[in-house]
């Protein structure tokens, strides 16, 4: 049912790009074929004209499923994450996509923390849903089942 995953993060001028990449890599298990990972770094400007980079990681197919399982396991390792997602899952699903933000600093330190803030790693899980109606309900059902609630 999972089609693809996109992980993205902003690297501010005051941050080390390698450390942000390490934080993103925390969400990618070692058994994923690196050749199946599409990594893109875009240099641009922030709202106030400050230089920033946007790191995008796209993965499809079987490798995306491995990452999804890994991220689900990371989320389940902390009850705070589960409680937060239980409370606001309806806000995190649109069409056939499930959106989650993770604390970028915590990820660098090897911790998974679901947050709503700005200094984040954004994950977008794109599901193949074949029914024309109730796509969002189907995605919520899949995610809730995976997370055990």
UniProtKB/Swiss-Prot annotation:
A Pfam family that the UniProt record links to this protein: RNA_binding
InterPro entries, sorted: PAB1135-like, Ribosomal_uL5_dom_sf
Record-given protein name: Uncharacterized protein MJ0213
Organism placement in taxonomy: Archaea, Methanobacteriati, Methanobacteriota, Methanomada group, Methanococci
């Amino acid at each position: 049912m999972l089609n693809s995953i996109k992980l993205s993060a902003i690297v501010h001028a005051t941050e080390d790009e390698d450390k942000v990449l390490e934080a993103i890599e925390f969400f990618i298990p070692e058994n994923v074929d690196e050749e199946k990972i599409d990594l893109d770094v875009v240099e641009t400007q922030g709202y106030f004209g400050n230089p920033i980079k946007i790191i995008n990681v796209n993965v499809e197919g079987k490798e995306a499923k491995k990452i999804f399982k890994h991220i689900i396991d990371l989320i389940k390792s902390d009850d705070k994450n589960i409680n937060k997602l239980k409370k606001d899952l309806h806000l995190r699903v649109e069409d056939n996509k499930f959106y989650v933000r993770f604390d970028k600093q915590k990820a660098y330190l090897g911790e998974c923390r679901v947050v709503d803030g700005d200094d984040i790693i954004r994950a977008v899980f794109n599901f193949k849903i074949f029914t024309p109606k109730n796509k969002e309900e189907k995605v919520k059902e899949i995610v809730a089942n995976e997370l055990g609630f």
